[in-house]
Amino acid sequence: MGHFTFIGLCLLAMFLSLSGAECYTCPIDWLPKNGLCYKVFSKHKTWFDAEMYCRKFKPGCHLASLHSNADAVEFSEYISDYLTGQGHVWIGLRDTKKKYIWEWTDRSRTDFLPWRKKQPDHFNNNEFCVEIVNFTGYLQWNDDNCAALRPFLCQCKY
């Protein structure tokens, strides 16, 4: 009797733990995180072309938004694993009004901005899109010309 009780309790615990788990499946080679799927692409595109490339996967896909230092650390490791020496990486943040008002393409809140020292600067009044900088270990951000060609990080909800 004790053996069956133990098995029953184990099955109940397994069921309860699984019922609270997120139910989404990312495509192969995409990183699952917080109910979204992320993928870094080594193709070099302008910021706008990268955003359009992300959107082609399905409605709701965009260049990635990052909201915490924990996110930044995890993505820096992910990007470093896939890109070696390929430069900075576009993310979904830009200054559409050109007044230092930074907005995510997915319209999520702008609550985390780990800028490099003396950034953003809108250098030559020509830098309004945001990249993760490779020589900071992909941990800090810089504003750059949106026409620059960069690898990029997409996010999708699957």
Swiss-Prot record:
Subcellular location: Secreted
Keywords associated with the record: Calcium, Disulfide bond, Glycoprotein, Lectin, Metal-binding, Secreted, Signal
Primary site of residence: secreted
Disulphide-bridged cysteine pairs: C26-C37, C54-C154, C61-C156, C129-C146
Tissue: Expressed by the venom gland.
Keyword Methyltransferase attributed: no
C-type lectin domain: residues covered: 33-155
Motif Galactose-binding boundaries: 119-121
Keyword Glycoprotein in record: yes
Molecular functions per Gene Ontology: carbohydrate binding; metal ion binding
Domain of life: Eukaryota
Signal peptide interval: 1-21
Residue ranges of the TM segments: none
Cellular component annotations (GO), alphabetically ordered: extracellular region
Binding site residues for Ca(2+): Q119, D121, E127, N142, D143
Glycosylation sites: N134
Record PANTHER family: MANNOSE, PHOSPHOLIPASE, LECTIN RECEPTOR RELATED
Family affiliation: Belongs to the true venom lectin family.
Physiological role: Galactose-binding lectin which recognizes specific carbohydrate structures and agglutinates a variety of animal cells by binding to cell-surface glycoproteins and glycolipids. May be a calcium-dependent lectin.
Subunit structure: Homodimer; non-covalently linked.
Protein name in UniProt: C-type lectin BfL-1
Species of origin: Bungarus fasciatus (Banded krait)
